[in-house]
């Protein structure tokens, strides 16, 4: 599988593979067995440029405040219980296996970054549209039977955008709460409290109680159990490995980990309660709805979109435009809807269709490479995943703390989720046909998405992402703008979008991003 990532100075391509699951015998704690996910690029040991002592006061997304979920005071560092915990760390370090040392190195680059990689791999694995049934029609993935055929979920672009946003937002609130309690109790790491313990991960003066590794693992495993239930075994093992690595490395004791795990799971429960009622369960609609959408377009005198799959496939999540956004109300979504596309009977539409045909018939090698680079179709981490991949490099190079990194991904992914909601609301409001529907002689260069054309999802996602990243990393603004434009035009090169789709999508994504940026400007983070 070919994934791509861009960075200032040009595109950087790298190959990643689907999750490789290695079997292991015995419990992870006992054996240190790595039921591995990856492979991923090596992350340098995390040595944050700031401890972010005020992060506990930064604005929450869903929690009412940093102390909403109580964390009991830890035992004193002079207590017999804590001394016994330190002895347990020393004992574990005296018998470390090479597998355990590899786990320490694997997680030492930061849990937020590592889990972001894992989520992208899960999206890629499950981003597979169901195959048609022998008798015709298509089966629907069932959350109640995630191991069935087809497996649940079908991690299409908007499912992926929602998944990235829930994981990132939950991690961010959980870590802000953890930071609040860390600086309430100020218990230093084991390696700081006992010089007989070797620091195998970079150790700072950041308080260790509750453990940020355990907080991240706890909140993430609970979110992913719901979002990717068929992967529950490997997700659970990776989360346990992260916590164990923190103990083996001398960064956390058992009570640091227990407190962090409980906090993370409690925060996840808040986010999962929201997810259960955000409208996603009914986003697929029904045949009656699908017909009504087509009839509405026809009644306006337009040619209605139809599926080009054989047999015709139901439209992809036509009610996703009604799924709850993070920083926009339903009224905001409607108010920001782009103006109508060119009429299907207009000269402009004829001209734009002709431009698509002319472009794909005279495609240069560079244009084809751009179309493929930004394809992000079935079997990949999706357009939102592409921007997460880009973002990881900037976060890594900035040496951000876990809570600062979580803020970046939360802002990015909330904006892209909201962009997906807004884009899908427009797509199914206008129900505009694809270029190859109006002119079947157009030969697309990439897969044809199974939903209406206007506006371009790539353009909307990319504009929202570029706007947020330009705020977070101002020095990269020109690069982000270039990637936004390249992602948009790639859809014309691929033969699947008109120019109007692209330009309207970019403008729409820019407007949607302002809602998340308003949150960011007032969240208290320096």
Task: Please tell me what each predicted stretch does.
Residues 1-14:
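N-terminal secretory signal peptides that target proteins for export/translocation
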Residues 16-21:
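Sec-dependent signal peptide recognition
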């Amino acid at each position: 599988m070919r994934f791509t990532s861009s960075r200032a100075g040009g595109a950087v391509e790298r190959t990643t593979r689907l999750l490789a699951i290695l079997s292991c015998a015995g419990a992870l704690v006992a054996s240190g067995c790595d039921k591995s996910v990856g492979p991923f690029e090596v992350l340098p040991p995390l040595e944050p440029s700031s401890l972010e002592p005020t992060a506990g006061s930064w604005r929450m997304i869903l929690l009412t405040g940093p102390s909403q979920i109580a964390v009991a005071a830890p035992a004193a560092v002079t207590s017999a219980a804590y001394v016994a915990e330190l002895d347990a760390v020393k004992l574990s370090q005296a018998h470390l296996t090479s597998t355990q040392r590899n786990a320490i190195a694997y997680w030492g680059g930061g849990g937020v970054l590592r889990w972001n990689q894992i989520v992208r791999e899960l999206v890629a694995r499950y981003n597979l549209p169901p195959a048609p049934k022998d008798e015709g029609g298509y089966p629907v993935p069932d959350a109640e039977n995630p191991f069935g055929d087809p497996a649940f979920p079908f991690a299409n672009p908007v499912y992926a955008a929602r998944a990235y946003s829930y994981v990132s937002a939950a991690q961010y609130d959980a870590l802000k709460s953890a930071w609040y309690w860390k600086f309430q109790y100020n218990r230093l790491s084991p390696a700081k409290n006992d010089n007989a313990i070797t620091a195998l991960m970079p150790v700072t003066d950041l308080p260790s109680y509750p453990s940020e590794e355990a907080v991240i693992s706890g909140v993430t495993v609970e979110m992913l159990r719901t979002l990717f239930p068929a992967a529950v075994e490997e997700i659970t093992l990776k989360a346990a490995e992260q916590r164990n690595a923190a103990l083996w490395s001398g960064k956390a004791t058992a009570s640091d980990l227990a407190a962090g795990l409980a906090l993370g799971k409690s925060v996840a429960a808040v986010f999962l309660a929201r997810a259960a009622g955000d409208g996603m369960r009914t986003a697929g609609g029904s045949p009656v709805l699908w017909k009504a959408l087509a009839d509405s377009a026809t009644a306006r005198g337009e040619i209605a979109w139809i599926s080009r799959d054989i047999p015709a496939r139901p439209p992809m999540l036509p009610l996703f435009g009604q799924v709850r956004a993070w920083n926009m109300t339903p009224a905001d979504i409607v108010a920001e809807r782009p103006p109508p596309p060119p009429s299907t009977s207009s000269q402009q539409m004829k001209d734009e269709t002709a431009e698509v045909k002319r472009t794909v018939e005279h495609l240069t090698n560079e244009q084809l490479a751009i179309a493929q680079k930004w394809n992000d179709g079935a079997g990949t981490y999706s357009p939102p995943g592409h921007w997460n991949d880009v973002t990881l490099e900037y976060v890594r190079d900035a040496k951000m703390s876990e809570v600062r990194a979580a803020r970046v991904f939360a802002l990015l992914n909330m904006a892209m989720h909201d962009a997906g909601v807004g884009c899908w609301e427009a797509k199914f409001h206008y129900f505009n046909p694809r270029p190859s529907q109006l002119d079947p002689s157009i030969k697309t260069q990439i897969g044809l998405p199974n939903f209406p054309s206007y506006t371009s999802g790539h353009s909307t996602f990319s504009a929202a992402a570029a706007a947020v990243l330009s705020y977070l990393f101002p020095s990269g603004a020109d690069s982000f703008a270039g990637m936004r434009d390249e992602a948009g035009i790639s859809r014309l090169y691929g033969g699947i979008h008109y120019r109007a789709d692209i330009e309207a999508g970019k403008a729409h994504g820019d407007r949607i991003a302002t809602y998340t940026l308003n949150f960011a400007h007032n969240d208290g983070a320096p």
